[in-house]
Amino acid sequence: MTYKIDERSIINEKNIFGQNTNKGNDVLDWDTKKDEKKIKLFFTSPCHGGVDIHYVRATLELQALLQRHKIPVTFHLINSSIVTQGRNLCTSAFLKSECTHMLFVDTDVEFDETSVLTMLKADKDIVLTPYPMKVIDWDKAKNISQQSGRHISKCGYYYPMAFVDPENIDCKDGITEIKRGPAGFMLIKRQVFEKMAEEYPHLKIKQQTMLNQQMRETENFWNFWDTEFDQEKGTFMGEDFAFCKKWTTIGGKIYANVDAYITHHGDYSYKGRFIDEGQKIK
């Protein structure tokens, strides 16, 4: 399911919930007209059985914000019970579009719409916002709570992320370089997939796939998103970390926006900001 919003759309200064969308954040003053290349965003989510209401609300607020900044956006949802296949099909749809950037958003993630502008403005090949896993380290939570004064329920989150140098994390304007990170809120430029297609021609998928109740061949269908198992080490890598590895192996770089609040919804709403977790960030 796909629908587009172009820069000619008209919106009110208030969003659909009647709240003023101007939060005073500097990124809201970003003049996209000064960019050399026109941004066209492809917002996509692999789904299975439904989406979280908080995800829907954040998506609608993002739509309003992008319209104000005259950034065209295509929204694309695909139903797949296999997350790797879902991500590959989303990527295929992006490559068939004329969009310049693809934004992966998992359907259990709630985000601040301004963080998307922050990632676009960073102008990186790949930039993501890390979100907490659905688990709490209570020993860590206790220590951070005692040191920071924050409530224990807001501490002790675990963020699945690997740094280039864990002992020397350099952060500028909330953006820092990483080795691996989650794909549930990840912005990727088109040129990333174009380069990966050149470097990994063996990943081309040629078989037919069920789409819209029909078996058909899919254009630009690549197995960029797949899990990885190291037989020698006996270690498993999820499709997002494995994707990051593919990109860095051919010289690419990955960045994270660590200064944005994001919520991972489940039985409990895990809301956090990586920079608050007592990490060494300078």
Predicted features and spans:
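N-proximal low-complexity "stem/linker" segments adjacent to membrane-targeting elements
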Residues: T2-S80, Q85
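C-terminal catalytic/acceptor-binding lobe
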Residues: Y3-N20, G24, L28-D29, E36-I39, ...
